[in-house]
Structure formats: C-alpha cells, structure tokens
Amino acid sequence: MITSIELIDKFDLKFIAGNVAIEIPVANADISRPGLEMAGFFSHYSSDRIQILGTTEMSFFETLSKEERAERMVKLCRKETPCIILTRNIPAPQELIDACNRKGTPLLQSKEATTSLISKITSYLESELAPETTMHGVLVDVYGVGVLITGDSGVGKSETALELVKRGHRLVADDNVEIKEVSRNVLMGKAPKLIEHLLEIRGLGIINVMTLFGAGSVLPEKRLMLNINLETWNKDKVYDRIGLIEEKLSILDSQITKKTIPVRPGRNLAVIIEVAAMNYRLNKMGTNTAKDFNERQNEQIRRQSIKEI
C-alpha cells in the first residue's frame, strides 16, 4: 500500500497541513490537475487521485472571491483523496490549509515543476501498482533479451543459466521470478530479495553469482521478451524444425514469444538459447529466416510445377 508518507520520502516533498498520519492509500496511478474543479465544476471530479496544483490552477484561484475560494478548497478535499501537492514551491493559500486541516487531507509542497513531478510520480505509481505474479523459472539477460527459462523441476534450468552466466550473460532471478505488468505486453521480472543473485545447482548447492563472477554478471530486473521452455525429449512428439510455429506464453494480460526446446544428452542448451535470443532480435529487426526459407521453397515448387506442365 502506497501512502502520502512514502511520497514525501520518495519525492522530497514538504508537509504543509492536514493529517499525514491518516494512511489514505493511493489506489490509482493517474494524476489529476483540478482545473475545471477550480471553476466550480465537480461533476466528474476524480477525488481518488493525487491532486496536483500548479501555476495555472493557482493563478485562476487568485481571481476568485473569498467565499468561492473557501468553497472550492473544501470541495477539493475528500476523505478518499490521498493528498494535494503544490508545485514550484507555490505558497499554500489559507483557504486550502484550513480545508486540509478540517478534512485531514495531507497538503504537500514540491519545488519541482508541475509536468516534471507528474511524470515522476506517474512512472513510480505505474510500477508500484502494476499487477504482479510469480513464476517458477530462471530469468537471464542474453544479448539484451530477457529470456525466461521454464520447464519441469530437474530439467536443467539452473545449470543452463550457470553456463550462460559463465559465457558473459547476466542472471536476474533463479527458481522464483517476480513479474509485474507495467503496461500492455510489457512485463518486468526480478528476483525476491531473499534469493537475489543466488543460483541453486543440484549436487553443488547455493552459489552467489555476483561474488563468483562479479557485479557484471547480475541484473536487478529485466523486461521479459522470450520464453524458452525446456522439456524432456519425447520421441512421439513432433517438434518445430523450421521455425514457422509461433507459440505465445500468456502472463497476466500480456503475451511473450515462446520456444519449446527438447532436452536430450549432447545438446548444448546454452548455445541454443544464445542463438534463440539473437534470432529473436533479428526477427524484431524485420528478418525472419524461417519465413524467407518457406517463401523460397514455395517459389521453387511453383517453378517446378510450371516446368512439368
């Protein structure tokens, strides 16, 4: 739960009036600039949002009569309003101080410009209030691609991650990956604090990757882009040999590209994942080798058919 106290510490805000001890939760990442409300229109007032008062709002406020000022500020302060913030160190008018003290709404002050403060608070709230879940797997940064390695227990996820780290890539999380959906199809993954930088290898135990390989071998968080699902080789299953099958892994309300890699003795999984990551980047740049091959093959078949006719 995010409250005004956390915002004070995070954004260097100054407490002016109200009751900061009242823990009114910030449940909405959107920020409101109550311009129409200053003019007296409260029909669609988003009272559950953080209210930001800048130079424009306060300049208009100065044109109001004394009675109108008091009335507008009382209406602005609601029990569900997390806080009201004055930007650019604008002095708080007495009407606003009285209304905040009466209703208990925290009144804060910032030295930052209005647009800059709104941008920073919005980014922070979107990250903190984003839907989240946890998944069993390993998250590794491979050539700048966030690769989530999944599969049954004992299939070799951690061992593969260790080989990738040894080859110069960076570990984000092992065994338990905390995932947040910061926006549509944008998933950020990180490790729980308890197991940050740790890797569990059967027969060896728990190792600290940062201590063994250095600070450059770990990453605090990474966007999930590609899922590599490891599974024991099944001779009765037909695996994709060309690359035309487009699988997707759904996490929360987002999807990422998925590749299923069969595991059997002699396969170098680390190299395969490296190539998968590079191929993913190549596809995003507009080059799809599988589709190009398929088109050339179809063209050759078409030409052969014409010759036979």
UniProtKB/Swiss-Prot annotation:
Signal peptide: none annotated. One of its GO terms (molecular function) is phosphorelay sensor kinase activity. Transmembrane segments: none annotated. The active site is at residues 136, 157, 175, 241. Mg(2+) binds at residues 158, 200. Keywords: ATP-binding, Carbohydrate metabolism, Kinase, Magnesium, Metal-binding, Multifunctional enzyme, Nucleotide-binding, Serine/threonine-protein kinase, Transferase. One of its GO terms (biological process) is regulation of carbohydrate metabolic process. InterPro entries: HPr(Ser)_kin/Pase (IPR003755), Hpr_kin/Pase_C (IPR011104), Hpr_kin/Pase_Hpr_N (IPR011126), P-loop_NTPase (IPR027417), Ser_kin/Pase_Hpr-like_N_sf (IPR028979). It is an enzyme of class 2 (transferase). ATP binds at residues 151-158. Residues 199-208 are annotated as: Important for the catalytic mechanism of both phosphorylation and dephosphorylation. It catalyses: [HPr protein]-L-serine + ATP = [HPr protein]-O-phospho-L-serine + ADP + H(+); [HPr protein]-O-phospho-L-serine + phosphate + H(+) = [HPr protein]-L-serine + diphosphate. Its EC number is 2.7.11.-, 2.7.4.-. Its cofactor is Mg(2+). Residues 262-267 are annotated as: Important for the catalytic mechanism of dephosphorylation. Both phosphorylation and phosphorolysis are carried out by the same active site and suggest a common mechanism for both reactions. Belongs to the HPrK/P family. Homohexamer. Catalyzes the ATP- as well as the pyrophosphate-dependent phosphorylation of a specific serine residue in HPr, a phosphocarrier protein of the phosphoenolpyruvate-dependent sugar phosphotransferase system (PTS). HprK/P also catalyzes the pyrophosphate-producing, inorganic phosphate-dependent dephosphorylation (phosphorolysis) of seryl-phosphorylated HPr (P-Ser-HPr). NCBIfam families: hpr-ser. The Walker A ATP-binding motif also binds Pi and PPi. PANTHER family: HPR KINASE_PHOSPHORYLASE, PROTEIN YJDM-RELATED. This is HPr kinase/phosphorylase. It comes from Macrococcus caseolyticus (strain JCSC5402) (Macrococcoides caseolyticum). The gene is hprK.
